[in-house]
Regions:
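A conserved short coil-to-beta-strand element within the FAD-binding core of flavoproteins
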Residues: 135-149
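A short helix-to-beta-strand connector/capping loop
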Residues: 120-133, 242-244
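Short regulatory "switch" loops immediately downstream of catalytic or recognition motifs
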Residues: 118-124, 144, 218-227
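Generic recognition of long tandem-repeat/solenoid scaffolds
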Residues: 150-155
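Basic/polar N-terminal segments that are highly enriched at the extreme N-terminus
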Residues: 1-6
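N-terminal FAD-binding dinucleotide-binding subdomain shared by FAD-dependent oxidases/monooxygenases
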Residues: 50-126, 138-140, 262, 267-335
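Rossmann-like dinucleotide-binding core of oxidoreductases
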Residues: 7, 12, 17, 21-36, ...
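Core beta-strand elements of the Rossmann-like FAD/NAD(P) dinucleotide-binding domain
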Residues: 156-165
Length: 335
């Protein structure tokens, strides 16, 4: 038998974002002698845990924007033009004013990923690649049979299937250790539906990263509302029913997640050509590499000098290490 005609059966364990990108890349490759089998324990492909109701409510947002997402078959700013109207209305998204540099509601992003998965599977069919999807199938065991170069996948209903290859795309997993044993203790805030309750006492949050922000958004929505005051600042108004409610973050470093901004110009300085000679000279003296101190001076501080002379005066004589210490002290003070 011609080896080029042999079909390689590939199992994908998990049908979330990782599986989506694996399928997209496999199907977009030159090889068509593959057969894909996708096992997903939920009833939806694409969204996974972070972008479905298992890991998000309406108030939760992504930590990436459209312009940062690795390429799929169509970008979000195109997909919003064909997205269901009820979905757009639900999240108050207008396709005509969609901004690809802004973060998105996670559940909205999950719907996009699911739609992209459908397109990837449709593309596979046009190439003659079979894709089998097993929704609501929980994989409980994977056996590597090295003597036969096979992998046996067992699902919860005690069904065994044999494949040539197996790719693990299981994504997030939140083990339970103390949850259920200690009253009112949660090992993680997921699914967020378990936090959709009210408290009239302080709530401790261990950590101050993006996961903590998810908790804050969920609890804030349940215990009050956000409004703009007379000066246009957004303020949180706690419900009078829960006057003793408050959130207390416990953090090892005392820092909240860094604020993300979008620069209208991807490069702070446009003076590339006249600096080329300096770059080449620095590489000559550093075995082909650029000195970090050189990059800090030329690519960062020189641009600051051009854009913000007053701030440049503060950092003009500081090394990269000095600058980091200055900024960290400033950030700690703000936090």
């Amino acid at each position: 038998m011609n080896s080029s005609n042999v079909i390689t059966k590939i199992a994908l364990i998990g049908g979330g974002p990782s599986a989506l990108y694996v399928c997209k890349n496999l199907i977009s490759s030159a090889s068509t002698n593959i057969e894909l089998h996708i096992f997903e324990k939920s009833d939806t492909l694409g969204a996974g845990m972070p972008y479905s109701i298992i890991g998000a409510n309406d108030e939760h947002i992504t930590n990436v924007s459209d312009n940062e997402i690795p390429e799929l078959l169509s970008p979000i700013h195109d997909w919003v033009k064909e997205a269901p109207l009820e979905l757009l209305n639900h999240f108050n998204i207008d396709p005509t004013t969609f901004n690809e540099y802004k973060v998105l509601p996670r559940l909205f992003f999950g719907r996009y990923l699911s739609a992209q998965f459908e397109k990837v599977i449709a593309l596979a069919k046009t190439k003659g690649i079979a894709v089998h999807v097993y929704l609501n199938h929980k994989v409980v065991d994977i056996e590597d049979v090295q003597t036969r170069n096979e992998v046996i996948v067992s699902t919860e209903e005690d069904k065994k299937r044999t494949f040539n290859r197996c790719i693990i795309c299981t994504g997030h997993y939140w083990p339970k250790t103390l949850e259920g044993n200690i009253p009112n203790y949660y090992d993680s805030p997921y699914p967020p539906s378990k936090l959709e309750r009210t408290f009239n006492h302080p709530v401790a949050i261990r950590g101050s990263s993006l996961t903590a922000i998810d908790v804050i958004r969920t609890l804030a929505a349940a215990h009050g509302r956000f409004e703009k005051n007379d000066t246009g600042e957004v303020c949180y108004i706690r419900s009078e029913t829960f006057e003793d409610f408050r959130m207390v973050l416990h953090s090892r470093n005392g820092l909240l997640p860094a604020v993300r901004i979008h620069l209208e110009e991807s490069q702070a300085s446009r003076q590339k050509k006249k600096k080329t000679d300096h770059v080449l000279e620095n590489r000559k003296t550093n075995n082909g590499f650029l000195s970090l101190d050189f990059v800090f001076e030329m690519a960062f501080k020189d641009a600051i000098k051009e854009k913000d002379p007053d701030f440049y005066a503060r950092i003009q004589h500081k090394t990269m290490e000095d600058f980091v210490q200055l900024m960290m002290r400033y950030r700690l003070r703000l936090n």
